[in-house]
Amino acid sequence: MTVIKIQKVKSLKAAVKYSVQDHKTNSDLITTFECSVESIERDFKNALMDYNEANNKNRELTSRMIIQSFDKDDNLTPEKAHAIGVEFADKYLKGKHQYLVVTHIETDNIHNHIIFNDIDFENNKIFDSKRENTLHNLRLINREISELYSLSQISLSKSDKKYIAFNEYVARAKGT
């Protein structure tokens, strides 16, 4: 089953450096949208400058990272896991945020790191994790894509609260 979590990035440079290490990715499981690995910090800052100018603000650069982990029993190839990560990023971010998707294959636990800019460059708005982009919605989109690829699922019944704690989410993934 696919487990997903999201967190704020403290240092974009460090997150990117960690994510794109050759021994973790074999150098070819990397996709970007509206940015490049080599200039990601500058690319994200350019969107931030446009946001600050349009909104008369002086915000600092902020970004987030989604970690999407796959169950080894789903027998995904690294390429398929990467394609799923890119599809997820496209659907969740709706073409409005710059992103980097990197698939790590150095362990039995294939997983994606999806680093994205908090700036919606299309509308000059900030990523809103409290309304449209809630953790619940993140998991629902992940679930839809997992179903599309016949990946095993975590039980999220309709009677569940809108929010379940990450520990409970992981416990359900393990079936405990």
Predicted regions mapped to residue ranges:
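N-terminal nicking endonuclease/strand-transfer module with a His-rich metal-binding environment
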Residues: M1-T176
